[in-house]
């Protein structure tokens, strides 16, 4: 005799307030288990001509993704990157338009590290500024094709697509 096992995965814990554990139990006919199986780092990816290395403090990052900082030559970005040739161009922010564990983890980071700026609670759906793109592959493609853009993405997509990454995030 064999037993059928239903399983699924997520980057985020099921949210009781949204009834997610009950939905999972109904779908799988058993109580859901939370088993940490993998860790997926998140990269901040950008496409700014002539800028090879970009350092962004967490408060500056939160201001960019909330829409409070709108241009690449904003004084806060210039102060953190004094030798960079930053254009006086609009920052094109991209976010995951699908429900995403990556979005949930990124917004959790912003809220915990810069909660006075990023006041939204963490969520699988985006609450900040910008334009939506489908899934991680769509984010990677949008940033690659759009000058003066920035986003967050799974590290594996950022490295696979050889996107520029802001690897120095300072809280």
Where on the chain are the PLM-derived regions?
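Structural signal for conserved beta-strand scaffold positions within catalytic alpha/beta enzyme cores
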Residues: 36, 95, 167-168
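Ligand-binding pocket segment of bilobal, Venus flytrap-like solute-binding proteins
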Residues: 1-6, 99-171
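Short beta-strand->loop
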Residues: 64, 72-76, 80, 88-99, ...
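Short mixed-charge
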Residues: 73-85, 116-126
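Second-shell loop/turn segments in exported
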Residues: 31-32, 46-52, 90-96, 126-130
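Short amphipathic alpha-helical patches
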Residues: 20-25, 84-92, 129-133, 166
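N-terminal segment of the mature folded domain
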Residues: 1-78, 86, 140-144, 150-161
